Structures are given as C-alpha cells and as structure tokens.
Amino acid sequence: KNAYENVKKYVDKLIKGTTNKGLFITGAYGVGKTYLASCIANEIIKNGKSVIFGTLIQLLEFMRDSYSDSEVSDKDHLNLYSSVDLLVIDDLGKEKPTEWVLEKLFLIVNNRYNNYLPIVITTNYNRNQLRERLCINKNYSIVDSIISRLYEMCGGIEIKDDDHRMSDSLIRESLRNSWYNRSISKITLDVKRLVADKNVTFLF
C-alpha cells in the first residue's frame, strides 16, 4: 500500500483520538519526507491542535538562546516541547549532536512518552544508521535509550521512489477535501508569547 495512503489513515486516527502513536518517516534524500510531515502538521493544526515543527537543531537553538533571556528559561522550552499536541522533528541525524543536545532530546522524548503524546520523525537513516549518527565517542547509552523510546512510541513508514513519483497526483486526489494541502510556512517564534500562551498553534 502506498506510503501516502498509510499516512492519511494515520492522521485520521490522530484527529479522532484513536491513536497516540508517533510516526517515523524514512527514505532517501529528496523523496518528500519533509513535505509529508508538513501535510500532517497542517492537518493537525486545521483541527485545532498545537504543533511544533523543526529540525532538532532549530528546536534546541531556541532553548539555548534562553540562557541570555531572564524571562524565558530552558525549562519553559522543555515544557513546550513536552506538552504540545504534536511535535515534528525533521531530518533527525543530519547534524552530529553534542552531549547537551542528546541530553535534551532524551528529556523531550521521555516526557512525551510519559504524557502519551505523539511525535513525528523524518530521517534518511534506518535504526542502526541513526544509532551511529547520534552516537558521540562510542558512548551508546543515551542514544540507545532515545532510539528505544522512539521506536516504542512510533510506527514506521518508508517512502520509496515509486511513492515519490506517485505523490503529486495521489495527494491531489486523496487529500483534496480533507487535508490542509498547502506548503507549511516558516515563521519566527515569539517565545515569550508562546510561554505565556500554552495553547497557541505555531510552526518553525
């Protein structure tokens, strides 16, 4: 069955509240993983839910910047990432992380796991490759904890070349009436406002 059809079914379940599982979207570079994750985010937003969408580095740069802002703490950011209705981390494994990044990623993933909240991940890598990409100095302990949690929380969909070639016509046909089918827009976050209003809908 085509990956796009499976994603549509997944989103329908999220909206109806019949699943709180997350989703791993894997595939080679350029097959449309980010676009598909954007479609998911837009549909969840359309149905009145809050979404954070960004790369891991983007997410944590906002947290790191809070060290110079006395009004917003890294704990505020952590709480946002842990409690938003849907968190989308795009292109996981692209950048080599630091120990600080892995520590924060584990806290976010573990908090969402404990709160029964979904997370969507896009990545070019399979499980073993992602393990190697995230590992620092052959210390696999925290990486294994992160990946184990993610795979326990998430189902998986692989986008192949055939799916990519079919994607334009299939999205127009199957998502025309029910999906908010437009490109996701990147906006600059007013973090102070977001911290004050935990129900705000926003995207990176």
Predicted regions and their residues:
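Pre-Walker A (pre-P-loop) alpha-helix and adjacent loop at the N terminus of AAA/AAA+ ATPase modules
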Residues: 1-23
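Short glycine-rich substrate-engagement loop in P-loop NTPases that contacts/grips substrate
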Residues: 4, 45-83
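Walker A/P-loop nucleotide-binding motif
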Residues: 19-37
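P-loop NTPase Walker A phosphate-binding motif
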Residues: 35-48
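Loop/turn-to-beta-strand initiation segments
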Residues: 49-50, 83-86, 115-121
